[in-house]
Design a protein with these regions (language model features):
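Charged DNA-binding/catalytic regions of mobile-element recombinases
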Residues: 1-179
Length: 179
């Protein structure tokens, strides 16, 4: 395992001739218009007081070069599950589609980080996307005694911690890189 800061990471990537292609238009990764059950926002005005009190999750896209694609690039989707207290990324998955199964993989990775004797309240907060509202995703949460929480009316500010880590990953860690 190697740990490097943003600037060293950028320097290494520059030395290797790798650059990220940034797009000016946003890609929608959230479909909040569905008939799946949604859950109330349980973290509004709540400050996380310990690790594994609140987890936040979101999905972002990363553009990659693909010579077989008509325009020479395509997108992959990164799901991140992060502890809101420690800001530690506990689970992640890079996937070719937005299917819920990939978000579940990130959640399951995060669950594996919990202590065996963990029995405190754990809230999982996300947007209202179909991945997070799917029966399969909710089942993994409830089977592991995790309480679902979702943004109100699709407001990204209600999931600001997760949105911020996405911004950091794309615009600081991966800035200028090509995949």
């Amino acid at each position: 395992e190697y740990r490097v800061g943003r600037d060293v990471f950028r320097s290494i990537m520059h030395e290797q001739g790798l650059h990220l292609i940034r797009r000016s238009r946003a890609i929608r990764t959230t479909n909040s218009r569905h008939n799946l059950p949604t859950y109330p926002n349980l973290i509004k005005n709540v400050i996380p007081m310990r690790p594994n009190h609140i987890w936040v999750s979101d999905i972002t896209y990363i553009e990659v070069e693909d010579s077989s694609a008509p325009n020479g690039y395509r997108f992959v989707f990164l799901t991140i599950v992060m502890d809101a207290y420690s800001k530690r990324i506990l689970g992640w998955c890079v996937a070719p589609t937005l299917e819920a199964a990939y978000s579940i993989k990130a959640l399951e990775m995060a669950i594996k980080t919990l202590p065996k004797d963990f029995n405190d309240t754990l809230i999982h907060h996300s947007d209202r996307g179909t991945q997070y509202a799917s029966a399969a995703y909710i089942k993994v949460q409830t089977d592991n005694h995790i309480i679902p929480s979702m943004t109100e009316n699709g407001n990204p500010k209600d999931n600001a911690i997760a949105e911020r880590i996405n911004n950091t990953v794309k615009n600081e860690l991966l800035h200028g890189m090509t995949f």
